[in-house]
Structures are given as structure tokens and as C-alpha cells.
Amino acid sequence: MVCPECHNTVYPRIMPAVIVGVINGDKLLLTKYRTGFKYNALIAGFTEIGETVEETVKREVMEEAGIKVNNIRYYKSQPWGSANDILLGFFCDVKGNDEISMDTNELKYADWVQRDEIILQPGEFSLTNEMMKLFKENKVEWKYHTHSSKNDEDMVQ
């Protein structure tokens, strides 16, 4: 942004955050946060300095639900202008054990929910709701960009 008076250029700080749809067959991992938002949500969190967004996906799912994931697929992004955030939506698959070990400091609920039992948020504005709706309607496509790296096993697990 350029000031019209002094012509000083200021670059806004944008904070990347991920929203993660973790898939386990015909079930999706849904959460509810301990405070604030009262509707179903997906795993979410901010990218740390020096971390790729794919590493953020793995770390946040492990921190909030105690689950390993793989087959990370970028879906799409959504700006969240009032908070200077850019939300990056990903789908991924549970890797191995699907037993949830919920972070009770952050979440009050985390569970695998069958496709036909998913209750969507009111309104159509959020990337989270769009991703839950895609899964509920069995419209998650597997053609989204898949992250692969020879170092996948060395990433946060």
C-alpha cells in the first residue's frame, strides 16, 4: 500500500494459516473449540517461521488430535481480511492409528463423523464450511495438488 501523501510504501503482514480436512474412509475429523466458535470446525492453525504449510498441516493435526496424516492435498485459499490472515485449505488422510488424543486445552470436541451425519455451519462464507460440505456430498476430488517429498518421514509426525 502506498501513502497518497508521502508515497511511503508499506507491505501488509499476512499470516498464513491452514484448515485441514482429515479423511478416514467415509469419516471426517470434526472439532469444536473450547472457547468462542460454537459450530463444527476442522483442524486449523498458523504456520510458524521456517515451516512449510505442509509441515503445518502435520503439526497441527498431531497437536490437536494426536494423529499422523499423509497424502496432503491443497484445495484452495480464502483471505480473512479483518485479521490479515490467508487461510489455506488442505485435505489429507489419516496415516495408521486413527485413535484421537484431543488437546483439551484448545478443543472441547474432536471425533470422526460419518459423511451423512456432518452438520454444516450456517451460511456459505467460510472455507471450513465449504470443505465440510464437499466431503459430506462426496465431492472431494483427488486431483488437488499432492505434496510429496523424499523427506516426508522426517517431517513433523
Predicted regions and their residues:
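Cys/His-rich short segments
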Residues: 1-21
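Conserved beta-strand segments that form the floor/walls of ligand-binding pockets within enzyme
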Residues: 2, 29, 41, 89-91
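Conserved active-site beta-strand-loop modules that form the wall/rim of enzyme catalytic pockets
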Residues: 17-32, 37-44, 54, 71
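Solvent-exposed residues in well-ordered beta-strands and their adjoining turns
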Residues: 23, 93-95, 114
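Nudix hydrolase/Nudix homology domain
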Residues: 37-40, 82, 103-157
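The catalytic Nudix box helix
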Residues: 42-76, 90
